[in-house]
Amino acid sequence: VDEPQTADWRSYPFQLVPGDPQLSFPAAEGNHLDCESDTWFIAGELTAESGRQFAFLTIFNKNRPGQSIVADFYTFALFDLDNGTYGTYTDYDMPPANMAPGARPKMFTDTGHLDMTYDSGAGHVVWRTCRDEQRRLIPYTYDVGLVGTDPAGDAMRLDLNVTPSRAPVPLGGAEYNGKIECFGQADTYSYFQTGMTMTGTLRWGSTEESVTGSAGHVDRQWFPMIANSGGPDGNVRARSHEWRTINLDNGVDLSIWRQFDRTNHNALQPFSGATTSSGDADPEFADDIEV
C-alpha cells in the first residue's frame, strides 16, 4: 500500500511540488527510467581536525542515447584550499569498449530512491540513502564513498555521512517549480538541496584527515533526451552553460544558472537566473541578474 504524501519535507514520501509526480521524494532522488540522461552532483567545503581546508565535487552521469547505448561517466575532484592545488579523476563507460562481449555497465542506479554505485578503475564508488534499524529510508541522509587517482598518481578517497538541514528546492522556485529548459530541452527537471552537514574521512596520498562541513550541496537534473542532444535542431554546440552555487554568510544559498546561444552572439537563453535557498524563508527566483 502506498503511503500518503506528506507536506513535511523531513518525512518520506514528500511532494515538493504539489501535483507533479516528477518531484515526489524519495523517487526524485533515484533513477528515472524514462529519461535518457540523469545526473547527480554533490559538492562541499570540508574542514579537517588539523584546521586544513578542503573542498570536493563529484558527478555521476547516466546517459542512455536511444535508451539502448550506455555512455556513463563518474568524476571526483579534491581541492586543497590552503595550498591552491587540486586533483581530478574521471572514469568513462563508453562505446566501443563497453560493447565488447561480456562487458557490463559500470554504473548501477536504483529506482524509487537513491542507491547508486560505480565500478571505476580506482575502485568501487557508492552514494546511497541510509536506512534505520527497521530498514526504512532516512530522508536525504546519505553514505557517500568516493575514490580516484590524482594526476601525480596519488590515491584520493572521501568517505562521508551526509545529513540535511533544510528542504530540497525546485529550481526556479515557484515560478518554474523545477521544470525548466536546459540545453534547448524543455521538460528538464532540476532540484537542489544546500546546507547539508558532512562528517567523515579524507585520504589523499599520504594525508589522512577527519573532516566536517556544513555547506554541502546536492544537485539533480534529469532530461527526457540525452543531455547534449542539441535541442530541436540537433546542434550539440549551440548552447553553453554556466552554473554556480554561492553560500552567503547570512545563511542564504544561491543556485545561479546562465545559458547562452553560441549561434547568436552568446545571447542569454532560458533557463537562466538565480534561485535562493535559506532555512527560514521560501525559495525566491530572479532572472534579472549579473554575474
Range-by-range predicted roles:
Residues D2-V291:
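Structured soluble/peripheral alpha/beta segments that form catalytic or ligand/cofactor-binding pockets
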